[in-house]
């Protein structure tokens, strides 16, 4: 049966401003779409563009698939051949997109909270275009967070009391920041592990840091993070990084896999560094949800886009 508790938002930039009820409604809506539920009947053409200023394959492709499944018209945008390379600001690019008729922008950008000047412009009055955050620097990744919540809910049917370990390059991960905050609010017990130099005491309010081998047999969810070498330009630990040593100390190998609880799952936002965060032979193992996460991402992003369509009263939705 179709869920009637539909979320309505003018923009979708963070999970921190979502209520638990809205998160649950988005999960229900995404599951509805996954189970073959009808997409909303749009009464007018809707135009959307994907503006990815950082490399992406999964998120970009997933958003475009979601957009096409909803019946939206996708306007191509290639930063490498745009006026951004001539010094045009993101605000001015967005102003132009609105002027030519684009209704919503999906943006990934290296700057944390790039969206603030687009949704709350201090020196401008005219920009009025929907913004969906596809990742901002090391800040937030709301769509990855919500597809992760959907995947966990699909497997366990609940969040309260689940033990979830977030392991790896936590400080530089926007996925970790979004997930730890929301998992905590949903009632899960959050734990952290990985190199201590990539951990910050500011995360203590969400969970507890432990050595991986002390956690492995107790966790319901092992959430592995990619080592983000591209964000380590000023990090002295980058020069001494040893992939084999990292895998031995912080990766899921065959031995640790055998120690997992029978119903435990392994998650990873991708791309996976084989034999670093996870042994190559375990990527398609029964407990690894990597491809399930990607599959669920399309349906969660459909729910997110629909929420912005409703929030902006586009296509006859409200």
Curated annotation (Swiss-Prot):
Keyword terms, alphabetized: Pyrimidine biosynthesis, Transferase
Pathway(s) the chain acts in: Pyrimidine metabolism; UMP biosynthesis via de novo pathway; (S)-dihydroorotate from bicarbonate: step 2/3
N-terminal signal peptide: none
Binding residues for L-aspartate: 86, 174, 226
GO cellular component: cytosol
Gene Ontology terms, MF aspect: amino acid binding; aspartate carbamoyltransferase activity
Gene Ontology biological-process entries: 'de novo' pyrimidine nucleobase biosynthetic process; 'de novo' UMP biosynthetic process; amino acid metabolic process
UniProt superkingdom: Bacteria
Residues holding carbamoyl phosphate: 58-59, 108, 141, 144, 270-271
Reaction catalysis annotation: carbamoyl phosphate + L-aspartate = N-carbamoyl-L-aspartate + phosphate + H(+)
Chain's role: Catalyzes the condensation of carbamoyl phosphate and aspartate to form carbamoyl aspartate and inorganic phosphate, the committed step in the de novo pyrimidine nucleotide biosynthesis pathway.
HAMAP family per the UniProt record, alphabetical: Asp_carb_tr (MF_00001)
Protein name: Aspartate carbamoyltransferase catalytic subunit
Organism (species): Lactobacillus johnsonii (strain CNCM I-12250 / La1 / NCC 533)
